[in-house]
């Protein structure tokens, strides 16, 4: 009798355990499904934008977000999207997408580049490439304002007359780049410099500020351009392809969470290159956390009120 009673109690306990397990696992899975994973590259710009998206999503919906940081390259982001490791790529650039992911020729017209990228990403990968946030993080030849005033420099072509006596500081990578690198640049603009000095991209800003370099190749959204009083020269021959920045989201994710569409669209076309420079400098120059810079921007522009 005792054995039968013991077996009955064990059976009831097992049944209760299985019932509880069956109830709790779907709950855990559902909770996980309610967390949107936002991918950010290993640079301030990407972390700021990712944080803006995350804060807006959490404020305006019941969804939770987490940021997957340090996605080092265009290829890594693409793979993470395709594998479902991230739900949103916060910052993708048309120039990288066309020549890198899509293996196509660069398109110099910004509108055509965007339209082509959007079409091909939908067709090949079922990914939605949104319109731009409003800024273009491309290469930009940059000089001190003093040098610009001295030689009356407004465009890259204006440099040609003085190039043989100028020292140029450039990114190591750009010297070897095919299609849009140094060799093709000299052919397009018909100029060579008195000296060309490859270095890490982060060093070019101090090099031109200190006068060690006369002209450098910079990233157009870097905050040091403004804080150091530097001047970007217009690429009047459109040598560099556009690198307009957009978020990218799998269509599957948008079907599962249609509320994301309206949130993402709130940010499109709102952040120009000068604004992105300022935001980047808050992180790189004033050493603020990207999440703090993102929140301050969103509060200032009343994103949480609408």
From Swiss-Prot:
Signal peptide start-end: 1-22
Keyword hit for Transport: yes
Cell membrane keyword on record: yes
One Pfam family per UniProt: OpuAC
SUPFAM superfamilies reported for this sequence: Periplasmic binding protein-like II
GO molecular function, one term: transmembrane transporter activity
Main location: membrane
A biological-process GO annotation: amino acid transport
UniProt-reported outcome of changing residue 13 to T: In strain: ATCC 6633
InterPro entries reported in the protein's UniProt record: ABC_Gly_betaine_transp_sub-bd
Keyword vocabulary terms for this entry: Amino-acid transport, Cell membrane, Lipoprotein, Membrane, Palmitate, Signal, Transport
Lipid group attachment sites (N-palmitoyl cysteine): 23
Origin superkingdom: Bacteria
Record membrane topology: Lipid-anchor
Record localization: Cell membrane
Induction of the gene: Repressed by GbsR.
Database matches in PROSITE patterns: PROKAR_LIPOPROTEIN
Any single Gene Ontology cellular-component annotation: ATP-binding cassette (ABC) transporter complex
Lipidation (S-diacylglycerol cysteine): 23
Family: Belongs to the OsmX family.
Task of the protein: Member of a high affinity multicomponent binding-protein-dependent transport system for choline.
Name the record gives this protein: Choline-binding protein
Natural source organism: Bacillus subtilis (strain 168)
Gene: opuBC
């Amino acid at each position: 009798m005792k054995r039968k009673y013991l077996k009955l109690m064990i059976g009831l306990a097992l049944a209760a355990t299985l019932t509880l397990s069956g109830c709790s696992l779907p709950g855990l899975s559902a909770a996980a499904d309610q967390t949107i994973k936002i991918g950010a590259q290993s640079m301030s710009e990407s972390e700021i934008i990712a944080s803006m998206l995350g804060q807006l999503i959490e404020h305006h919906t019941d969804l939770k977000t987490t940021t997957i940081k340090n996605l080092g390259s265009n290829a890594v982001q693409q793979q993470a999207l395709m594998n479902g490791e991230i739900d949103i790529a916060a910052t993708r650039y048309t120039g990288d997408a066309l020549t890198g992911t899509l293996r196509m020729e660069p398109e110099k017209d910004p509108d055509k580049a965007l339209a082509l990228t959007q079409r091909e990403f939908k067709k090949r990968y079922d990914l939605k490439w949104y319109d731009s946030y409003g800024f273009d993080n491309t290469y930009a030849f940059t000089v001190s304002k003093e040098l610009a005033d001295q030689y009356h420099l407004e465009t890259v072509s204006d440099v040609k007359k003085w190039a043989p006596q100028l020292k140029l500081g450039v990114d190591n990578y750009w010297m070897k780049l095919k299609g849009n690198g140094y060799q093709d640049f000299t052919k397009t603009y018909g100029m060579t410099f008195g000296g060309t000095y490859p270095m890490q991209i982060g060093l070019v800003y101090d090099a031109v500020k200190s006068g060690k370099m006369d002209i450098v190749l910079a990233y157009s959204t870097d905050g040091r351009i403004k804080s150091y009083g530097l001047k970007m020269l217009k690429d009047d021959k459109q040598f560099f392809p556009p690198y307009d920045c957009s978020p990218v989201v799998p269509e599957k994710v948008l079907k599962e969470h249609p509320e994301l569409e309206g949130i993402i669209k709130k940010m499109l076309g709102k952040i120009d290159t000068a604004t992105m420079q300022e935001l980047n400098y808050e992180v790189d120059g004033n050493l603020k956390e990207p999440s703090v810079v993102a929140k301050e921007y969103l509060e200032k522009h009343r994103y949480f009120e609408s």
